[in-house]
A protein has these predicted regions:
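Catalytic core of membrane glycerolipid acyltransferases/transacylases, capturing the structured
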Residues: 4, 42-100, 125-132
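Membrane-anchoring hydrophobic helices of lipid-metabolizing enzymes
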Residues: 1-49, 60, 82-88, 93, ...
Length: 235
């Protein structure tokens, strides 16, 4: 899996270019099947959960095809790359929100629109609780549960690359009053999808950086994480 994942990570750079600059017709040709797309075609606000795959850029293009969706981004240090990224994404998503604009993204959904949100990342402990992720307790953002409690749909999008294109499937995460139960089901949707194509998951993404015991399983990133924590405190 390690070797295949490294290959897929490299291929992801090519897929990024395809996502940013290909025509809609080319994107349509890459989509084998979009199962349950009708779930997303209503006029109600929906939080659309995306997965961190090695082809995440093309995933956003595929899932938003023919649908008006907003998305979040983390600014890149290189201003040129950042400019290219935002301009490219603005061609196929309705609005690009800074990753720190949480309240704006929630308002976006409340206004009857669809927001792409990657809930499989570690946002720290401030707005998260620990929930199993592959039987490992992982810091899990609680925003999706909050949205579901406001009677908005939370829909997980599974995308796997096959030999002849990409399979896309939408599945609603059933609302639950209990926060832990809802988030456990959400994480299970993620892990079930990852198991289908483990080589396509972005394992270099630090999913387990916040630990119950306060430990650090990514020591090489320690200084960068300390800087980001200070940035979050000052924001």
């Amino acid at each position: 899996i390690l070797k295949e994942n490294l290959i897929n990570t490299g291929v992801g750079i090519i897929e990024m270019g395809i996502a940013w600059w290909s025509s809609d017709r080319k994107i349509d040709d890459l989509t084998i099947h979009y199962k349950n797309k009708e779930i997303l075609e209503s006029n109600e606000g929906i939080l659309v959960l995306a997965k961190h795959t090695t082809h995440v850029e093309i995933d956003v293009r595929l899932m938003s095809r023919g649908l008006k969706m907003g998305g979040m981004y983390r600014p890149q240090k290189n201003k040129i790359i950042n400019h290219i990224m935002i301009n490219a994404r603005n061609k196929y998503i309705e609005g690009a929100f800074h990753h720190k604009q949480a309240s704006q993204t929630l308002d976006y959904v409340r206004n009857g629109k669809k927001m792409i949100y990657a809930a499989d990342q570690d946002f720290g402990s401030k707005y998260s609780i620990f929930v199993p992720f592959f039987k490992e307790m992982a810091s899990t953002i609680t925003i999706p549960h909050g949205i579901s409690q406001e009677r908005f749909k939370v829909v997980f999008i599974k995308i796997n690359r096959k030999k002849n294109g990409y399979e896309v499937e939408a599945k609603e995460i059933e609302p639950q009053e209990d926060q832990l139960e809802f988030l456990t089901n959400m994480n299970k949707a993620y892990t079930d999808s990852i198991i289908e194509s483990p080589e396509q998951f972005l394992w270099v993404h630090r999913r387990f950086k916040t630990r119950l015991d306060g430990g650090d399983v990514y020591p090489i990133w320690k200084s960068r994480e300390k800087r980001r924590q200070n940035e979050r405190k000052s924001s």
